[in-house]
A protein has these predicted regions:
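Helix-to-loop junction immediately C-terminal to a conserved catalytic motif
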Residues: 64
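Conserved ABC ATPase "signature" region
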Residues: 112, 116-119, 124-144
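Catalytic Walker B motif of ABC-type/P-loop ATPase nucleotide-binding domains
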Residues: 173-177
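Helical segment within the ABC ATPase nucleotide-binding domain
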Residues: 188-201
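ABC ATPase "signature
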Residues: 233-234
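Short, charged/small-residue-rich alpha-helical element at the C-terminal edge
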Residues: 238-309, 313-314, 318, 324
Length: 324
């Protein structure tokens, strides 16, 4: 299946998939976004993190064209989302946290019904929609293609959500808490799917999640939104190196386990001394701060500097309904 995806991969388009400059949003007298700026290249996987009320949902809805902004410049796939037409929207995929649908739909029938919308917007470079049976195979639902939606398990149901979001072979996919309710096996398979979309289809992915381990595994870059602005932008390793000061060195000598905390964040000198002074060291490992540690440090710094909790007031109930 990966070879088929590679063969059909659309060519790289010029310019970033997302370009946001000084994005601002105000609800009444409350400023939710106070100057958000970032860009995403084609085929990049970004995770947008932040505490509840930080403005994540508002940001995503503006990028999707579902909410008007107060100020700032936004370009998504080369167009202003506020002026995006149906042809532009057909290039986007949205995987919501929940989807209300008619329980009598069968998997193949539902995807076939939705796929028809995208047919007029296919091009030579990007044929649309995705072949339904191929898509069902990609998301791991071949054995369940003729089942009614109500018969699917939670993990299978979430795979269908993903299939619904990408049936039009989008160039940009928005994922909202994509693996909520997944068991570990289903989560790993979903991660593989996201990587295949980015690597073989050159699909840009912007995901929001509260699962920091998932963000660390999936994202090429991590954005942290707090107080209405981006307070960090980089890989998990870059953020840990820049924002946390402690690393942990663990080793074994004579069957006894030892642990040492390095406060300056660079354990290289300590490890060299350790190995030079004791040749019997085994099971040596260095643990840097986790993304969770880094994230908590960032949020604490941002809220302390701002003198207030994260901006609130955004609406977060994002659902869609399909009628039979």
């Amino acid at each position: 299946m990966e070879s088929a995806m590679r063969a059909q991969a659309p060519p790289t388009s010029p310019g970033p998939a997302i370009d946001v400059r000084d994005l601002r949003m105000r609800y009444g007298t409350k400023d939710v976004l106070t100057g958000v700026s970032f860009a995403a290249r084609r085929g990049e996987v970004l995770a947008l993190l932040g505490p509840n009320g930080a403005g994540k949902t508002t940001t995503i809805e503006i990028l999707e064209g579902f909410r008007m902004r107060s100020a700032g410049e936004v370009s998504v796939l080369g167009q202003d989302p506020a002026r995006g037409d149906e042809a532009w929207r057909a290039r986007l995929g949205v995987v919501l946290q929940s989807w209300r649908d008619h329980s009598r739909w069968r998997v193949r029938d539902l995807l076939g019904y939705l796929a028809r919308f995208y047919a007029p917007y296919g091009t030579t470079d990007v044929p649309r929609p995705w072949d339904v049976d191929e898509l069902i195979d990609v998301v791991g639902l071949t054995e369940h293609a003729d089942l009614k939606v109500q018969k699917l398990s939670g993990g299978q149901r979430r795979r269908l959500d993903v299939a619904i979001g990408i049936v039009g072979r989008p160039e940009l996919v928005f994922l909202d808490e994509p693996t909520a309710g997944f068991d570990p096996h289903a989560r790993r398979e979903f991660h593989d799917l996201v990587h295949r979309l980015a690597d073989f289809e050159n699909t840009t992915v912007l995901l929001t999640t509260h699962d920091l381990d998932e963000a660390e595994k999936l994202a090429d870059r991590i954005l942290v939104l707090d107080g209405g602005t981006i307070v960090a932008d980089g890989t998990a390793d870059q953020l840990a190196r820049e924002l946390t000061t402690q690393a942990e060195v663990r080793w074994t000598v004579g069957g006894r386990r030892h642990v040492h905390a390095v406060e300056d964040g660079d354990p290289t000198a300590f490890v060299r001394r350790l190995l030079a002074n004791d040749p019997d060291v085994t099971e040596l490992e260095v643990r840097r701060a986790s993304l969770e540690d880094t994230y908590m440090t960032l949020v604490h710094r941002a809220e302390t500097a701002g003198g207030r909790p994260s901006a609130g007031g955004e609406q977060t109930d994002r659902t869609e309904e399909v009628q039979a």
